[in-house]
């Protein structure tokens, strides 16, 4: 018999309908479900695909460097980072007439170009790159790494080079290598780069391979290290009038604890960051020697977990059985990894703007907005994925006998309490927050704004004060000039930090009021509701009172037929599907809040946010409508402008988003009838009926249609907001 797609599933390959194609694509990466899979081959396939992933990442970053070197304006941007627009790449489009060519010819380019809002220019400048040749060199090196990764991927699928199952399950060795190798050594290497290349470059010294061994990053070299006088490395830091990239006002220190920002670049001190990475390297190099391997020293994770039985018996048998449960479940491990990575990605979003690490990025407002939004959306998708794989773990990998009465089993045992508490929190937040917004909205509508209910966020203001913000007049901890906390750090990092916190030209601890109080609670509602749906989906994945045998139906069943009505919409997949809508909704509020607060901060009219953010019409009129006006004006009788492409994308995003509903609000019967009518017409149309196909066309399954609808909804939602964000910010600030 001829081999048909998918080769990994004989059952699907013999399916006579178009279901074969869609189910084949959907399960192509679900290696566990493939016909002749073994646990060992499963691990080997995933391992090899990781190298493929790395190859794609290196190729993509290489492309960024290459296109900027070839078509960008890196060298002229360096001369004046605050006024030259960084170019991502050139645009060639046969549709462009003269007005379009003129509109998109910017940043000193000869023809139409795209402006870079990714922050790569600022990053490359900060880490010591200075010429197009540097960029080309980096691109070639990454291309080499990409090729190497592809070879490694192929190599580890060859019989001689396939790692064994025991190698994959050796958790202690993997942890040691990842902690000390991946984090420790790479952080140490990065410290080395900052000290030997980036810091000299910031002081006007050009260090490359040809003079790398001749230029001492510190006048006394390794002397202070070897004689134990480490504090010398912090002496004579760059002065407050240092011009970045020049020797003017530069010092000689390489590892400092200044705190705050470089006055000219508005970014963290490079010498502080080098110090930070050295500390991280030190910690992780030690951490990478903690676990017991062939040498018989260090901790055994299994022993640690088995020994950790909480006193008083309040948590049953504690962590017994967890080691094997986690070590034998790829989904559990992936869930943990995604949860961690999701949190880290969101932290990146929060810290990139509040503590900007790259020179001049804080003054590139569009880039700041784009990076915050990008990282928050990515974090949302990654975190929902964590719960999805947690649910798959419960269905495919969880063994009740192995986990009897341990902390994991006890989570399942009291899931009703967990879910109902989350439900209560969500209801409380939702009704109270919406109640306040609606009340305020009505008061504004009736012309009595003084009757609004405006609550000052005193606890949050108290926390800001404890960290040194003096605006609110709380005399506490770091805002109390005669307290022990204040005095302890005065000679170290504190002056720089306090200046930064109390200066209103950055995003550190922005002044907050009633509008912030309300939107924080709206975001809390979104977070708790998303969590409720995800946690319920995972904890009910094996079964519920309604459907005790749910685990036998797998991860993504649509319903258990008409015989058990009411079993639709309760698979673990459905929980993930519903949670993504709430996740998008929540991150919408998060990014609206961040963007509006910052637009008013950058324009110097913070009172607009403070006054308009306390009622619904304020958000709709003064944020969304007011800032989308430029987008709606992308094309007009006077020709086009550089925002036209975003205006088009704004419209296109709405179209994609709306298309999602076509899949979300109609079911199979309608489409099956339509398909059969179209097939009938096709077979009776001359010429068209020369084209025939083997598979009988059938409508998408309920689950598939939901996935397609969700994908369109998500992509359209994000496209629309991306266009709005970039156009409304760049239209104001360039």
Swiss-Prot record:
Family membership: Belongs to the PsaA/PsaB family.
Quaternary structure and interacting proteins, as annotated: The PsaA/B heterodimer binds the P700 chlorophyll special pair and subsequent electron acceptors. PSI consists of a core antenna complex that captures photons, and an electron transfer chain that converts photonic excitation into a charge separation. The eukaryotic PSI reaction center is composed of at least 11 subunits.
Molecular function per GO: 4 iron, 4 sulfur cluster binding; chlorophyll binding; electron transfer activity; magnesium ion binding; oxidoreductase activity
Protein name (database record): Photosystem I P700 chlorophyll a apoprotein A2
GO biological process annotation, one example: photosynthesis
Top EC group: oxidoreductase
Annotated [4Fe-4S] cluster binding sites: 559, 568
Localization per Swiss-Prot or TrEMBL: Plastid, Chloroplast thylakoid membrane
Keywords: 4Fe-4S, Chlorophyll, Chloroplast, Chromophore, Electron transport, Iron, Iron-sulfur, Magnesium, Membrane, Metal-binding, Oxidoreductase, Photosynthesis, Photosystem I, Plastid, Thylakoid, Transmembrane, Transmembrane helix, Transport
Organism: Hordeum vulgare (Barley)
Source taxon at top rank: Eukaryota
Lineage: Eukaryota, Viridiplantae, Streptophyta, Embryophyta, Tracheophyta
InterPro entries xref list: PSI_PsaA/B, PSI_PsaA/B_CS, PSI_PsaA/B_sf, PSI_PsaB
Transmembrane regions: 46-69, 135-158, 175-199, 273-291, 330-353, 369-395, 417-439, 517-535, 575-596, 643-665, 707-727
NCBIfam families: psaB
Catalytic activity: reduced [plastocyanin] + hnu + oxidized [2Fe-2S]-[ferredoxin] = oxidized [plastocyanin] + reduced [2Fe-2S]-[ferredoxin]
4Fe-4S is among the record's keywords: yes
Residues reported in the UniProt entry to bind phylloquinone: 671
Cited HAMAP family: PSI_PsaB (MF_00482)
A single Gene Ontology CC term: photosystem I
